[in-house]
Design a protein with these regions (language model features):
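Conserved, charged catalytic cores of large soluble enzymes
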Residues: 1-58, 135-148, 158-256, 339-387, ...
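Secondary-structure capping and boundary motifs in well-ordered enzyme cores
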Residues: 18, 36-37, 82-84, 95-99, ...
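Function-dense linear segments that define catalytic or interfacial modules
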Residues: 27-33, 45-54, 62-134, 142, ...
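Glycine-rich phosphate/pyrophosphate-binding loops
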Residues: 115-127, 165-168, 352-355, 527, ...
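Catalytic alpha/beta core of large soluble enzyme barrels
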Residues: 258-259, 263-272, 313-315, 401-582
């Protein structure tokens, strides 16, 4: 549907949404049968409060959403309280080493994708090529079964808008790893190509220690992995050791392990033959942090997400293909409250992404989120009880925090930065399934207006420079001092530093900040890395190894110059992550 021009700002839609980015995005598939944004927010708030048997919470939930404090994941906004889909559309399934389970998981994936699911698939248990099988034959390995899943996901529609999406997870030490690494390349035997699957390499501590010790096989596998990431952006990486060492008490007491991640790499939950994880997500808006930091927003958001999960359980129960997902959701009730607008928050306060002030802000915000989410889960346990995997912990949920990419959510939140990621460019054109936009960094635009240089000439110059302001001479000599714009104040932060783009930020600084953040996140973070095309392999290797050493659980895309130009910056992010765009 198109935007209804009769809708009134502040009545039918929030005042902060009075911009083309918000209007085109929310009217691009999120609203049902002509409902206004306000009616959509009401639908969601009412439904979730009802699932909690707490109708008095409806108004509180609605206010958080209306103010732009709580930003709903795409399926939560689109489907909660409707009969057109489920409020969760991101799943993870693990495949056992038998033809029966390989086939059953293919059916499960097909049925999940039919209902709008993006699916992570773990194939590490499948025996390698050349291994013996029943009947005196030998296995053809993992790759042909990836082809089966590739064909299934391509053939299965997600609603009427987009095709199914899936990622395949395999251990870097699996004997088929080298061949698996090439399945997305359109060359060789077409029956061994999987052009529609995404990939994730699962990397353990044992492997990383062998790599550090100079083991030739480990170095060869790691080198190929990084070469492929530089060339294509993938595979993602799951540091399995970091993940399982940090598992919550509920997992440790039940001997539950993480073997894989989801299609956007922020979910690290247990999977096996009978348990498939679900991604129950939404985000708090850091652009409005000063408005809500002394409120109950984070606490209420966990109540909200627990209600969303209950909506999923009740609607999915009894549906063929959802048995493993419902079973996992009921036993663990894992949630993933994240954030959107981190870089916007820093820029609004005149803080450079690199440096101590950003680190202090990281600790301030994410420690608060950790405390408040756990307080909420304890209150939920007192009210509704502990699920099976949480018995004895005093908690309602095994997990509470995960930071998704939030690409669409950044638009639905008033044109702010996505997740915890730096802006790829300060201005760019973006073509998505939800519309075409010219997106300008609104915090930079405020500065340019104040300096009376918010002109087409300046923006054209920034666009020509790939979204960078480093060659804008009019910004020379301007600084931020305690968040205020000043002239020739060399003890302050240069404006150009504050508005550095992704590739201009030292990636070791980004990883260091991510390591601080990871200490407060019990799931994972969709963490991209960005390098110039001429970045030396030694530097790329150093950053990746440092990510492992800092305890980071997952790495998402590795972006290079080809996907960082200002005019195509938005295409660097996987569009299929609408599945879990929290």
């Amino acid at each position: 549907m198109s935007w209804n021009t009769k809708w009134v700002k502040g009545i039918d839609y929030p005042s902060w949404g009075d911009n083309d980015v918000y209007k085109k995005t929310i009217s691009g598939g999120y609203l049902i049968n002509g409902e206004s944004p306000k009616e959509a927010y009401t639908r969601v708030a009412k439904t979730v409060a009802k699932r909690l048997y707490k109708p008095e919470l409806e108004r509180r939930f609605f206010e958080h959403i209306w103010k732009g404090w709580l930003c709903l994941a795409s399926p939560v906004l689109s489907n909660t309280g409707s009969d057109r889909g489920l409020p969760i559309s991101c799943f993870g399934i693990d495949v056992a080493d038998s033809i029966m389970d390989i086939g059953n998981k293919n059916l499960e994936m097909m049925l999940l994708a039919k209902h709008g699911g993006g699916v992570g698939i773990g194939v590490n248990m499948i025996r390698p090529a050349g291994a013996k099988i029943t009947g005196n034959g030998t296995s053809d390995g993992v790759v042909p079964f990836c082809k089966v899943y590739d064909s299934t996901i391509l053939a299965t529609n997600q609603g009427s808008v987009r095709r199914g999406a899936a990622s395949v997870n395999i251990n870097v030490e699996h004997p088929d790893f080298d061949e698996w690494l090439e399945i997305r390349e359109p060359k060789g035997d077409v029956n061994r190509q999987s052009l529609n699957l995404h990939q994730c390499a699962v990397v353990g501590d044992k492997f990383m220690r062998k790599l550090e010790a100079g083991d030739p096989d480990a170095r060869q596998r790691w080198g190929k992995l990084l070469q492929k990431r530089k060339a294509t952006g993938e595979p993602y990486i799951l540091f399995k050791g970091n993940t399982n060492k940090a598992n919550p008490d509920a997992y440790k007491s039940n001997s539950l392990k993480v073997h894989m991640t989801n299609i956007c790499s922020e979910i690290v939950l247990h999977t096996d033959e009978t348990h498939s994880f679900v991604c129950c997500l939404s985000s708090v808006n850091l652009d409005k942090y000063d408005e809500w930091k002394n409120t109950n927003l984070v606490y209420d958001s966990i109540w909200f997400l627990d209600g969303v999960l209950e909506e999923f359980i009740q609607k999915a129960k009894g549906r063929v293909g959802f048995e493993n997902s419902v079973r996992s959701a009921e036993k663990g009730r894992a949630l993933g409250l994240g954030v959107v607008g981190w870089h916007t928050l820093l820029q609004k306060n005149g803080i450079a992404f690199e440096g101590l002030l950003a680190q202090f802000k990281t600790r301030e915000i994410f420690s608060k989120i950790k405390i408040e989410t756990e307080r909420a889960s304890r209150a939920l346990a007192e009210t509704y009880g502990e699920p099976l995997w949480c018995v004895g912990t005093g908690m309602r949920n095994t997990h509470l925090r995960a930071i998704a990419p939030t690409v669409s959510n950044s638009k639905l939140s008033g044109n702010i930065s996505a997740g915890i990621e730096p802006w790829a460019a300060n201005v760019f054109t973006e073509q998505t399934a939800k519309g075409t936009f010219i997106r300008k960094n609104k915090e930079l635009q405020k500065i340019l207006r104040r300096l009376k240089i918010d002109t087409p000439k300046i923006w054209d110059k920034i666009l020509k420079d790939g979204g960078s302001v480093q060659d804008i001479k009019e910004l020379d000599g301007w600084f931020f001092d305690k968040g205020k714009l000043t002239k020739d104040h060399e003890d302050g932060e240069p404006v150009k530093n504050v508005f550095k783009t992704f590739k201009e930020i030292n990636q070791l600084e980004l990883v260091n900040q991510a390591g601080i953040r990871q200490d407060y996140i019990d799931q994972a973070v969709s963490l991209n890395l960005a390098f110039p095309s001429e970045a030396p392999p030694r530097w790329i290797n150093q950053v990746h190894i440092e990510a492992w050493k800092r305890g980071i659980k997952t790495l998402y895309y590795m972006r290079t110059e080809s996907v960082l130009r200002g005019d195509i910056a938005a295409n660097a992010m996987n569009p299929e992550c609408l599945s879990c765009d929290g």
